[in-house]
Regions:
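Class I SAM-binding transferase module
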Residues: 2-53, 57-305
Length: 305
């Protein structure tokens, strides 16, 4: 199964190519773009001040301008910022977009915003730090009562069978490696992987692992636990993770398997050892995600009896 970033194999400028590939894949995701356009059009009012966090190529900032924003503060800490500046000029938005170079938690804007928009929803929902920077923005960058796009973010987990993806972990223990790579194996076990799953990879129905209202959420870790029910015989290699999000009233988006044309992948939390499961088995799970999305811990156990 493929893992991002993908694309043609061959000599090229890796840094520029990765940036262009990544953002082009999002722009080609029509469901993603249409949903954000509808949400922004319904939320941004003429004359609003908007802050776009993780503005990337500037697409959401452009949508906000078209919705009537007086000024958009586009905050971006990556190299795509310079491309976004050029695109704003080429598309006639440069007079209404102020680009702010840096991470949103480390910069200021000259006036509080009426609307916060952002597309930093990760493959597993919370892996791009949306809780930490949203709380910071609410406290420092927004006026009281400001509106958010997205408003709400949920994460789902399900037992998954994925032989190919589990090799990302198990291959570090194979014979034939020139030295002792046990440390790499331990790190792989603690890694959230991004994979391409289908419903055929799932061994049971999903369970809600997180439901976060970004308008009110505290800057705290997500902690959750539950019980998964196995619907078919197979081998469980890990927990599959995906999200759904309420962007604005009546506008939602998700990356539930299968991906079809989605630019999002899925999250995969591997088990140390695969578990043979049968229909009717129950598995308890625990999960914790830091507000920054950098630290994930999880545990899965068979429920005996």
């Amino acid at each position: 199964m493929s893992h991002p970033p993908g694309g043609p194999v061959g000599p090229r400028d890796s840094s520029s190519a990765t940036v262009l590939d990544y953002h082009l894949s999002m722009l080609h995701d029509t469901a993603r773009m249409d949903a954000f356009r509808r949400a922004i059009s319904a939320t941004v009012q003429p004359g609003d001040v908007v802050v776009d966090i993780g503005s990337g190529s500037g697409i959401l900032s452009f949508m906000a301008c078209e919705a009537g924003a007086r000024m958009v503060y586009a905050i971006e800490g990556g190299p795509v910022m310079e491309l976004a500046r050029e695109l704003a000029i080429d598309n006639g938005f440069a007079d209404r977009i102020t680009f702010v170079d840096g991470w949103s938690t480390e910069v200021d804007i000259p006036e509080p915003a009426d609307v916060l928009i952002s597309e930093t929803i990760g493959n597993a929902g919370f892996d791009e730090g949306i809780i930490a920077w949203t709380v910071d923005a609410r406290e420092r960058l927004l006026r009281p009562g400001a509106l958010l796009v997205p408003q709400r973010l949920r994460m789902w987990v399900a037992p998954a069978e994925s032989f190919d993806d589990h090799t990302l972990v198990s291959d570090w223990r194979t014979t034939g490696l020139p030295y002792d790579y046990a440390a790499a194996h331990r790190r792989a076990l603690r890694t959230l992987w991004f994979v391409d799953l289908t419903p055929g990879n799932l061994l049971g129905q999903p369970e809600l692992a997180a439901d976060v209202d970004l308008r009110t959420a505290p800057n705290e870790a997500i902690t959750s636990a539950g019980t998964l029910h196995v619907d078919r015989d197979g081998t469980m290699h890990g927990l599959a993770c995906w999200f759904d999000s309420l962007l604005s009233d009546g506008v939602t988006i998700d990356n539930a398997p299968p991906r079809t044309e989605s630019s999002w992948f899925h999250g995969f939390l591997p088990l140390g050892e695969p578990i043979a499961v049968s229909v009717g088995d129950q598995l308890t799970w625990e999960l914790s995600v830091s507000p920054t999305g950098e630290h994930w811990t999880w545990q899965v156990d068979r429920l005996e009896g």
